[in-house]
């Protein structure tokens, strides 16, 4: 059985980011009432699978759970920015960044997450690749002290734990 154009768009999004949740698809691809049926059809077609609410592309075999969680957290922040009409679209990036988000003013914002215990190496990578417009996502407020390692300026620092509580950026 064939897949529809909208299902193909959903599948393309899941292939691109490897992991997402239904809310991410609703925000970036398809906010129609049929989105859940489209996702279910892709599962039935064995194009994607869902485990604990996380939608994964069928081609992903050896899941790195830390990397999966990073992708989901960055997409959570991007989805909130899109809901607030602060960004228009997103596209994938190479490390150390996860996505580039196009703002309403046609500027690009480069988003990455800094993991606990890896601050020194990840911040050094961000410093080396920082072109401006960088949004750093910290897992929690204990990581703030590491920001002094940066030699370049970042546009915004978001603490994910706080974001989860109040959905404010």
Q: What positions do the PLM features span?
A:
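Hydrophobic, Leu/Ile/Phe/Ala-enriched alpha-helical segments that form helix-helix packing faces
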Residues: 39-43, 77-85, 129
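Nuclease-adjacent, charged terminal/linker segments that flank catalytic cores
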Residues: 1-65
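Catalytic cores of nucleic-acid endonucleases
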Residues: 109-165
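Short glycine/proline-enriched coil/turn segments at helix->beta-strand junctions
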Residues: 29-32, 105-106, 129-133
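Nucleic-acid-binding surface
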Residues: 13-14, 48-123
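Residue-identity detector for threonine
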Residues: 4, 16, 27, 56, ...
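Short, surface-exposed amphipathic charged segments that create phosphate/polyanion-binding patches used
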Residues: 169
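Generic structural signal for beta-strand residues in well-ordered domains
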Residues: 3, 102-103, 127
């Amino acid at each position: 059985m064939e897949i529809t154009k909208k299902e193909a768009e959903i599948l393309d999004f899941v292939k691109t980011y490897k992991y997402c949740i239904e809310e991410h698809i609703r925000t970036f691809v398809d906010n129609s009432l049929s989105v859940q049926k489209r996702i279910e059809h892709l599962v039935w077609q064995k194009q994607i699978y869902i485990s604990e609410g996380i939608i994964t592309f069928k081609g992903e075999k050896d899941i790195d759970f830390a990397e999966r969680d990073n992708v989901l957290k960055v997409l959570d922040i991007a989805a909130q920015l899109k809901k607030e009409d602060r960004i228009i679209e997103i596209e994938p990036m190479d490390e150390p960044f996860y996505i580039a988000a196009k703002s309403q003013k046609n500027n690009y914002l480069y988003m990455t997450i800094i993991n606990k215990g890896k601050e020194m190496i990840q911040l050094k990578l961000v410093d080396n690749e920082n072109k401006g417009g960088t949004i750093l996502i910290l897992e929690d407020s204990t990581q703030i002290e590491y920001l002094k390692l940066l030699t370049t300026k970042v546009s915004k620092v978001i603490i994910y734990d706080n974001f989860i509580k109040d959905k404010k950026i």
